Amino acid sequence: MDVTPIRPSQFITRTGPGALTPTVEGSMLIPQLSTLVQELMNSGTKASVNFSEPDSFGKTGLQKFEINDSRMERMLRHFNSKPGKSFEKNIKMFRLPTNADLRIKEIDPILKGFIFPRWGLCTQHKGYGLVMQFSQKSNFEIILDCPKCRDQNIVPIRGSPIRFVQACTNGHLQDLYWPYLVHSGGNNCTSKLFEWRDIGGDNFIIKCTKCREQIDYLGSNGLKIRSINGRLKCQGNFPEINIQAYAQGSCSQVIIPGTGMMGSRAKLVMLNSTGLHTPKNLTSVQIPSISGPLYRELFPHRAVLKSILLLKHDLDKITLLDHLKQLGTEFTNDTINEIERTPENELLSLVNDIVSELTTNNKNNKTLSESQSNDEELTSLLEAARTGYPPSAKIGKKHAYVNIEDIIKIPSPEFGVTFRISPIKELRVIKTQVGYSREIGTTDDALDSTNSRVGTIKKESNHYDDDTTRWYLGDENIGEGIFIDIIESEINNPGGLNPIGSSSSNNIDTWNSINSTLDDILTNSVDYDEVKKDELKQEITHSNPTFVWWHTLCHKLLLNLTVDSGISLVSFGERVYCKKNTRTGKYQSGILIYSSATGSDGTLGGLVSLVEEQFMTKLFKTCSQGIVSCSNDPVCSERKIELTKIEGACCHACELLSETTCSYQNRCLDRNLVQDTMP
């Protein structure tokens, strides 16, 4: 196959193991992470050789591309732990190596995928196409060996893949096996060559070239009605784990809506359906306490620095340099030169900070759930908004990432609150893909209000295990952000610190009812494991009216900011925080809007430069107008929420964003709720 470029960030947020990716020649299934890593290690290609050879620090293989983040490692440990038993192996992350990292040409492949689906369509014959299996030389190399092309002395072409596959909410994926579907009436025909004839509209017919049995798409016994009524047999396949396995497993059945009968979970799905593969990502956003090129060079060797400090209590710059030079390949000449140029007091302070950070992380090695991580992020952001970050006593000659003098307050009579806006000059964003689900069909799973996903999260394909360590694929970016929260206001309104305040409406009552129902489910959830309980805790947070208020406002801010910041909408990220203070019983909340990019320079300040009083005042006024009206009203405004559909008044004309921008799958949005709180 020809090479198809994929960015590392795209691999994490949009594709990953188990995903079908469009290529120049058709469709490719990305294998499990273990297969990808083994290919990098053992394929014998130039990329594989360069991947395995030691770098200037003596590191080889995955260690060369390791991402260090203690918070994410704690989250991954929680994700892998079982009730009462913590995960025992080490957990580490690595980034996807690029062609430049492996010193190969941009057109040379690094990773290989499987051809999927394995049925193709030859389109070289007038009036109809021919459906047949690809002739597979290996898992990664195929041809469409059309017998009719051979008979007519026509050179066979690659053809195109069949545009449908079969998938289910348990994560299974398989080809539509045409011999079974066409000959399902008991016909003993063994032919595997079929005609594809379009007969108008969306309908088409698949007909056996030998016995002339056929099946259509829209008929009373067609593919579509079979899919709706649960009559497509699921064989329980995970082709990203074993592409050769076919019809070897089984899958549980469900009650089919409308019929009340038990049936298959399998559904007919288009290749390009976004719900066919929905990644499960963990995200950690932090304001670095220390940063800079020298920090990034020294941080991976923090254990070495700790040993030097233990040996030399009265450490000076000359002694430190002598010890580092004795380590040979551990440190590059560029690092040594940077150390020599750095003033001694700044250098020793940096080394002490790095070692102190290591000691703190080693002591704080408890598992961390997603909801706990979000609460930690909110606490640190609120503290930064109050005192700046790092606090003034620690800044020295370093620049502050949150400068207290840059924070502004914007009274908003439109929303009835006073916003505090804190520009954050540098953020570190870590994303790790830990699984995926297949969000397809409408089964009884869709009625499960305790989960934002219809499909079951499958995590077996998304890690690689060696003897001592479980590795996950991650992505590390540097960026900037704007944190927005609410402060005490003199505006005469029902808001205050809580944007909902004393407001009351049917919409707010409905959201409160949903929130209370989910809370009751959590209280009685004795059979749930820790990961499932954490997912339910997040659903409770996301259905809180305060969260919905902030999330709806955040989307409107993003849609307006993209016009003025020069940053495309898909490059933005969002974090919505809502945490109940156990001491006071009140809610702390806010939003973080950020943009990040690979490399030490991040996004160069285009976002934080917009934090200016006149601009932000106008921005909130514009957003309030967009909250009140939508070009799709009254259709949009009449959408009402319920327990099984917790999306209120929102549509693509006013609120919905791309999947890569919204961290919450465009759920828990409601313009009506925000309107009910406006003066």
Each model region followed by its residue ranges:
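Charged, low-complexity interaction segments
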Residues: 1-67, 184-548, 556, 573, ...
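N-terminal alpha-helical interaction blocks
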Residues: 1-144, 148-158, 164, 174, ...
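Cys/His-rich short segments
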Residues: 101-245, 249-251
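Generic amphipathic alpha-helical segments used as scaffolds and interaction surfaces in large
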Residues: 109-116, 155, 471, 537-552, ...
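Conserved structured core elements
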Residues: 116-119, 140-143, 158-162, 202-205, ...
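Short loop/turn segments at secondary-structure transitions that flank enzyme active sites
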Residues: 170-174, 182, 214, 488-492, ...
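Elongated scaffolding segments in large macromolecular assemblies
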Residues: 186, 597, 606-679
